[in-house]
Amino acid sequence: MTRTRASGATGESQAWLATYLGASKKPLTILAFLLPLVVAYEIGLAFALRSSQGVLTNKAHVTLLRFFDTFGISAGGGLYLGGAVLVVVLLVWHVLTRDPWRLEPATPGLMAVESLMVTIPLIVLAQVILRNSAGSQPMPATPVVDPAALGSLTIWSKLAISIGAGLYEELMFRMLLIAVLHTLLVDVGKLNSTLGAVIAIVVSASAFTIYHPQAADLGSGLFYFVAGLYFGGVYVVRGFGIVVGVHAIYDIIMVSMLPS
């Protein structure tokens, strides 16, 4: 009887885990998880990141603004458009999958916990590389300004800029770049899906490294490449929501460690 009950409990746990792993990769659940981050960043753009010199943001967001500019949308008009685009993309994705408009209330909270846990190895990696390189500053994964300038920001500005990096850098380097590369390699080039994913992750990590000006230093360059591989692996295995959460949490922790 005891063995039967234990077996039943194990089966229920495995079924619950499988349900969570699947649900957390669905676009509607990802939207529910990311919507508070999108709103927080938009509020940050309006208040915490605005000064007499303009609005401080990350390079990925600036790239998106330049893309909007090609369609005649000015930087001022497109500044808050990125968040809307991300929401629309997830909603369209949900409609195309034809999944029901139903959410498990606990799933977004569990995704936050998972994101925090998955961030820990990246923090350990950063500290190991930091101790063995010439640099002495924590390494945020967002190239906004130099570390000294990041350290001078208010806590709310640091929080907003970190969230923005998670949203827009993962949108650019993981959701868009990996998807495009995988389509070209697998659907067009007829490569094996796993091999195509690996190549896409490596290329994305290389682009992510070049994107960071600090990567000119050997130690920093190594970190950003490995971090790009890590983010790419998380994206492929656990989806867009979790990788955004990991990136944002990592940056929040690293930026908060910078000296004022």
Spans of features found by a protein language model:
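Interfacial helix-start motif at the membrane-water boundary
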Residues: 63-86
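Hydrophobic cores of alpha-helical transmembrane segments in multi-pass inner/ER membrane proteins
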Residues: 3-4, 80-92, 172-179, 240
